Structure formats: structure tokens, C-alpha cells
Amino acid sequence: MELPGGGWELVKAGESATSVHRRGAVFAKTCGPDGVAELLAERDRAEWLASTSVPGARVLDWIESAEGAALLTSAVPGVTAGDLPWSEKLVASLARAVRAVHELPVESCPFERRLVDVVAQAEDVVRRGAVNPDFLTDDARLVAPEELLARVRAALPAVQAAQELVVCHGDACLPNFLFDPDTLEWTGTIDVGRLGVADRYSDLALVKAQLEDEWSVDAAAFFAAYGVVEPDAERLAFHLLLDALTWG
């Protein structure tokens, strides 16, 4: 998808056949024809989130053609958590940010990420042989994707019975939360294409994994600041595995 005008700088190639460019205070996420529906979903969620108390990117324009689509959004001030060094203050700020998203009124959110739909997405990825091993844990890489999916299916009834529905980010990784590098106050949230009502543990599992993988720290301080006294280890493991099977 060709962007209008000049001066666009490539920032990154995304996980879902998208590319991100920047020109000044404007970001443009582009995709080919096959990615239009997914990018449109992100646009709609970003527009909804902008109507809430959660800070994030504002949708500036939407361009669609036979070549694909482009979503133009405002830059969010601050630095991603992934680009900042670990500190107790930053972990506490991250917990407050995730909690703020989760405290948005469920009844006002028009988007859902029902477990059965996410499992169906994982089934499609496994069926196509498209599981990305980069998203799997070291132990999971040693197991056939079909067996991993079978484990998800077996655990699904118990997780469904225990789920706590909140507005979830859907991809609650460190690069998607930005903070003031001096005060470490939360400045905004980006990449909300998977936002929707879901079990809060679908976000908590990703945050826990990121803290351990990127900062090599225990997630206990995060859970304490978030307000979970005894995290459910089985639900954390379930959602981490399920998420890994949906990227492909």
C-alpha cells in the first residue's frame, strides 16, 4: 500500500503482514488486500478507545484501495516500556495502566474476544501449519502444535468457568504501553487491534511472560500493584499458550 506524499520513514514490519511508517507526529500502519479486515478492526478499536479515559493514539485518516489499506494515527508521547530499564516504579505504573484498561465499563465496549473465537483462531493457525515458534516457550517448541492445541481444548471448560470478563488490550506486551521516561508515568497505549471483552488473565499472562523474558524479573510485584493476591497459575499458562497459537 503506497502512502500519500513523501517523507515516510519505515519503523518496522509488523507481525501480521503490516508495516509501520512515521512522518513527524503521524504513524501509518499499512497492509495488503488480505490484511484490510484486520487493520479495519484496529481502526475501529482505536476510535472507540479514544472516546474513553484511556490515553492512546487518535485515528487521523483511513485510506483504502485495491492495493490494501493504511491507518494513520497520532504519535503517542513517551517511550515504550520495552525501551526502558526495569524499575519498581515502572512496574507499578505498568500495573496501573493495565488495570485502567480493565476498569473500562464492559457494557460500553462493542468488541469481544470470546474464548471460543480465540480457540477457533488457534485451530485455523494450527491447521494451516502456520504456528510461529518465536511465540512459543522453549518447552512448547518441543511439542507438536496439534498436541499443544489438544491441551488448550482440554483446559478450555475450566478456564471458561473461571474467567473474569473485562475490557482487555488483547496484546498486553511491553512495547504497547508508553511512559514518560523521566517520571515513568503512563502516557498511552497502542496497537489495540485485539482489544475486546475477555478474561483479564489473557492480558495478565502476556504481561507476566514479558516481565520474565524482557526484564528477567519475577512478576510478583506487578500482580501486587495490579491487585491480584494469588494469581491463577493454570489460567496464566492456558492464556499464554493460546495466544502463542494465534499468531500465524
Where are the language model's segments positioned?
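Active-site Asp-x-Gly
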Residues: 36, 164-167, 180-238
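A cross-family kinase active-site recognition segment
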Residues: 63, 81-147, 151, 157, ...
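Juxta-kinase regulatory segment immediately upstream of eukaryotic protein kinase catalytic domains
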Residues: 1-8
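Generic alpha-helical structural signal
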Residues: 40-43, 92-96, 150-153, 205, ...
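Short coil/loop residues immediately preceding or within conserved phosphate-binding loops
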Residues: 5, 54, 162-163
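Short, basic/aromatic-enriched C-terminal tail that caps enzymatic domains
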Residues: 234-248
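ATP-binding pocket architecture of kinase catalytic cores
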Residues: 12-114, 125
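Active-site acidic catalytic loop and adjacent metal/ATP-binding pocket
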Residues: 12, 16-24, 59, 150-202
